[in-house]
Amino acid sequence: MRQWLLLKDILRTGWVRAGVESPESVAAHSWGMSVLAMHLCPDSLDKMRVIEMCLVHDLPEIEVGDLTPHDDTSTKSEDEHRAMARLAPQWLDLFEEYEAQETEEAKFVKYLDKLDMALMARIYEEKQGLDLSEFITSARKVIGETNLK
């Protein structure tokens, strides 16, 4: 159990690379997604499952690290699956559901993942005067234009 809390100490690699001062941790990102889920989850979805998926989808990063498109991700899927099986086998089904992107809940969690990133990019841009448009562009590929005004 204690190892799960290490997610609080892992900084989001993309923000570090972009020069963000005091970037959020991976755990803060998961929390942000969960709060967005509580507010935005459609009634047609299983809200508890969505929130649970938000909370555990990045747990493997405790062992694998927070990889970005700039990293070698050729073994990311396998590495993360093995890490999740070791760290929290009781939540492996949630992780696999998220990774497969076949259920509406998993697709919504992916949407929240990108929405949280885009919202944080805007916050960091406003507070720190950075150009984080690459993050907004990346998010738009998943969530569309209308949600990022």
What residue spans do the PLM features occupy?
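Active-site helical microenvironments for divalent-metal-assisted chemistry
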Residues: 1-149
